[in-house]
Amino acid sequence: MLDRIKGCFTESIQTQIAAAEALPDAISRAAMTLVQSLLNGNKILCCGNGTSAANAQHFAASMINRFETERPSLPAIALNADNVVLTAIANDRLHDEVYAKQVRALGHAGDVLLAISTRGNSRDIVKAVEAAVTRDMTIVALTGYDGGELAGLLGQQDVEIRIPSHRSARVQELHMLTVNCLCDLIDNTLFPHQDD
């Protein structure tokens, strides 16, 4: 059992090292995409399922409340946080549309959709991205594995941050770290002296 525990930590560390080498450019581009949208008076919509939903809610909460230091609130909405809306849509047998309907209702040109999917194949996330494209929104996608169907939907202005792993637990761990990096970069770009 102890060896298995050490193996989990070792694998996580190795994935973090690989990500630290592979992802800084994509994370930087994503952060600047989010910052520019906010500076233009737009908002960030985010969504995910399961652990990815928790990461989406963590991001939105960090924007609306704060990340590590006090600063003005920033507009972000976790589309997976409203159980009444989700279950109303799903109750009409539109499970794949639970996020897309919200994107079509709330999203505007210049907004960003932060779409989080471990494998990139969740139908409701894919449909949300398709809806965001029709609303002239930019997409920041957090994926893993081979990026899945989601990776193929992204345009030139969009950003994919693909965790270099084929293990769901490692991908999800690194998604949380990536969300924290994005929050830190947004705060330090928009409010550079807040932590002094």
From Swiss-Prot:
- Taken from the UniProt record, the cysteine pairs bridged by disulfide bonds within this chain are none
Keywords annotated in UniProt: DNA replication
Biological process GO annotation list?
carbohydrate derivative metabolic process; DNA replication
Gene Ontology molecular function:
carbohydrate derivative binding
InterPro entries, sorted: DiaA (IPR023070), GmhA/DiaA (IPR035461), SIS_dom (IPR001347), SIS_dom_sf (IPR046348), SIS_GmhA/DiaA_subfam (IPR050099)
Q: Which SUPFAM superfamilies match?
A: SIS domain
Looking at the record, the residues that make up the SIS domain are 34-196
Gene3D superfamilies documented for this protein? Glucose-6-phosphate isomerase like protein, domain 1
What family does the entry list?
Belongs to the SIS family. DiaA subfamily.
Describe its partners and assembly state.
Answer: Homotetramer; dimer of dimers.
Per the entry, what this protein does is: Required for the timely initiation of chromosomal replication via direct interactions with the DnaA initiator protein.
Q: Can you say what this protein is called?
A: DnaA initiator-associating protein DiaA
What organism is listed for this UniProt entry? Yersinia enterocolitica serotype O:8 / biotype 1B (strain NCTC 13174 / 8081)
Q: What is the lineage of its organism?
A: Bacteria, Pseudomonadati, Pseudomonadota, Gammaproteobacteria, Enterobacterales
